[in-house]
Amino acid sequence: MVVGNDYRNDFSLPGTESHQAQQTMEEKGAAQAGDSIQIVVRDEDGLRTAAHEKRVAAMLKKVAAQDSVTAVVSPYDDKSAVSRDGTVGYATVTLDGLAEEVPKEDRVELIDVAQDFEGDGLRVELGGDAIRSAEEGEGGAAEGAGMLGALIILVFLFGSVVAAGLPVITALFAVGSTMGLIVMASHFVTLADFTPPLMMLVGLGVGIDYALLIFSRYRTELLVEAAGDGSLAGGGGADEGSGRAARKDADRASRPGQERAARVALDAAGRTVFFAGCTVIIALLGMYALGLGSLQGVALAMALTVLVTMLASLTLLPALLSAFGGRIRRNVLKRARRQAARGRKEEGTAWRRWGGGVQRHPWAALLVAVVALGALAAPALNMRLGFADAGNDAESTTSRQAYDLLADGFGPGFNGPLIVVADGSDADGGSDAGGGSDANGGSGADGEEKGEPVKDAAGTLRTTLEDTTGIAAVSPAIPTKDPSVALLIAYPASAPQAEATSDLVSSLRDDILPRVEQETGTQFLVGGATAAAEDFSWKVQDRVPVFVAIVVGLSALLLMAVFRSVLIPLKAALLNLLSIGASLGAVTLVFQEGWFGVQQGPVEAFIPVMIFAIVFGLSMDYEVFLLSRIHEEWEHTKDPSHAVREGLAHTGKVITAAAAIMIVVFAAFILSPDRMLQQFGLGLAVAILLDAVLIRCLIVPAVMQLLGRHAWWLPAPLAKLLPRVRIERHEQRGPESGQGAPEAPGQGDYADAGLRR
């Protein structure tokens, strides 16, 4: 029976040097069974006093008696565990499993037990991944803030809590259902522990967005029906002031119109939502092609989230509309009558006027927007990828304070040591490596110990590393169960996330270690968490071009088939790449450069690909919503300028509302204490803001005006090869379809993507 989740982080990359080093340590018995934590103690007057030794011994005795603890090494048992000035020391506590396998309550109790011994000048802090995860909150505040913000926007848009609640209910149901599936899947597929909040973030944003578009079209069709049967003018139906019986009779009488409105909304906006959802899923599944450990599981989980939210919008939402249709209809008509009584201007006038202004000065609009996006994207060129560590935690946490104490006492590189594996198991005693066979006593038959060659090689390496710029200290060779394998721990002079440390790893692998290998005939591998983070970052950078090509290529083919154009997909791809670059530039400025007082550090290695996948898909949504309406007008009028103005007029308000909701949901995650979620939320919020403001309002109308009729050009040979895919409902315009009939007040106000009947 499967109970609970089994989330686990796996950033190992088979084929990388750090992964090979880790495998060697596991095979040769050098890797401990469980994770370890450090209990850091400090006294400015020195730790080597009888009183402190007694207090620390009592603390460690009690710690050793705790559940999940298998071994404890006192700082007084290892001279290297006390700083040179004697003020900082650390005890190593080995757990009986990996950090995620040890119950959180056991880890919290360890913190409490150890810190109970503070006093008389002794300071006690705890560090390690097990401690960091124990201090993490359960979350929920960011998600709640996002939902509240989205609900407020919807209430202002629709003027009704019931109407505003339907998209939120649909999104919550979809996300909740997917969460249950993912919890079960975590027992069979590797899923990172940050998968649930990412699913919540994407699911809420996309789910509310999709439901909003269908619901908006439904409201529009209710107004069309009301305009046709006289209800809108007050000649039919019953408002809230009528009796209950009268309202029920009116609801029954309007039931066929409600059902027709729901069918049209699904047939029109539903097609758009389906296509938009498919583009997001394609982009997310593109991450799977990267082959980056648990990131593949994250890609599948988020793709499933989008799929379920899309299906919920196409199935659950119509059911809710059926249940609340009468009440929604009364609210829609009541609001429309109030707007008519106020003499409100035709909806979309402001957007139509804006489009005309951009069309009169297309080059100026294009230049301003592109320069702004380019300037914001420029910092992304200097982006450094990596992983946050305890040095990025809040200063109030014990893990951050332990990190700082160790850096003060032992140097900044102590928190990110490099583990060098010396593997002589494949070394040939008769190697031609500079006479190494003679120096090592080339005849094992003479009785020399098997471990002597690797011991000598490790000694040679240690001497070399001690003279290497950028290395502060090197441990003596550490033997393993296999005498042909030994370990050395090299402590960089720079912090784990510093660029100098990254350069040091490259220098060791490309220059220093190959020379020692040639001299000794022993293979050396650089491993450890710091080296593994570098490997992951480099692998991401190597595979990103393929990933981008797959996502952009497939999305462009879909757009080409839908809009029968070569230039439209090309324009969409370039603009999306520009907005994504700008959002990554914003993330770089804030989190890497430390703008607004944020702790400086690298951008999480997987953030760029995840932001690219999600933003590219969502940007395509807005592209499809807008261009579908423009395309429809173009097919009927063959006037490109008119088509663009009408496209903006009929989609501007709903795209703005949808974008505002996504921005609020995504930006709420900046409130999360998790640095990775903060980066993700900021990147997505900035990307959607730029897409809705600069791209949809300036660049798209400017480019479409400049392209004119050429925007819809498609070579005849290519037209024959591409399948015909239509999003907009293609029917003859006339009285039955609403053409020629007076537009219902507020109809344009709530048009989804402008996809008419």
Residues of each region from the PLM?
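Structured non-transmembrane domains adjacent to transmembrane bundles in polytopic membrane proteins
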Residues: S12-S36, D43-G128, N382-V598, P602, ...
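Juxtamembrane "helix-exit" motif at the C-terminal end of transmembrane alpha-helices
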Residues: N5-R8, I39
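Membrane-embedded transmembrane helical bundles of large multi-pass transporters/channels
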Residues: M1-N5, V69, R84-G86, G97-L385, ...
